[in-house]
């Protein structure tokens, strides 16, 4: 009885070990590909398989095959380049690039470039494209035609990146700086333009004041002509009228003054008082 029990326990132990080994093998034969990812299978005997594995749980041959996981979502990267413009000005330009690998070219990317494809490819091709594009514009055009520069760089960079299996979803110029000499020249030009605008304003103001003065003088001259014409038409009657008005005004002022004494036209009253 005891011997039978020992045999049974031995068999159960063997089965348990077998199940553990089988479970371990099954676990190593499964791998997951999450959302936004793709996988490439590396086989120890045949190398990189020319197929792309989508999302989900998948099987492989343990110890023979290995999954290489790629993130295929857009990733931002900034690349800065110092190059020369058409008029030989130093240009410091930075591009912000949203990039991702082309899913159907992942085996080729892994085989020829590796998982660090972005670090190996993007800085190199961005420098190459920017040097070629910036050399077509002078410094002033780089400022005034920034959208044109960005568009040309985007078209050329997308074509170049496609050769390596990279897709560029968005490209934008985030920084654009020039050498100190050009910057100082631009600042001096801006100051000169401001001074010119100020001088132009003062000249226009003086012209307006001159026109106003001429208009006023012409109005005064016209008024004087009209008065002279009126005096000539009225003759002595108008002069006598002005004298009467002036006398009335003087009399009114003197009447309000208490220290003023009126004397009649007959001087005999004053003579009688003196005698």
Swiss-Prot record:
The keyword Mitochondrion applies. It holds the Pfam family Band_7. InterPro entries: Band_7, Band_7/SPFH_dom_sf, Prohibitin. It comes from the Eukaryota. Keywords: Coiled coil, Membrane, Mitochondrion, Mitochondrion inner membrane. GO terms for cellular component: mitochondrial inner membrane; mitochondrial membrane; mitochondrial prohibitin complex; mitochondrion. One of its GO terms (biological process) is spermatogenesis. The keyword Coiled coil applies. It is found in: Mitochondrion inner membrane. Residues 180-213 form a coiled coil. CDD domains: SPFH_prohibitin (cd03401). Belongs to the prohibitin family. High molecular weight complex that consist of phb-1 and phb-2. This is Mitochondrial prohibitin complex protein 1. The gene is phb-1.
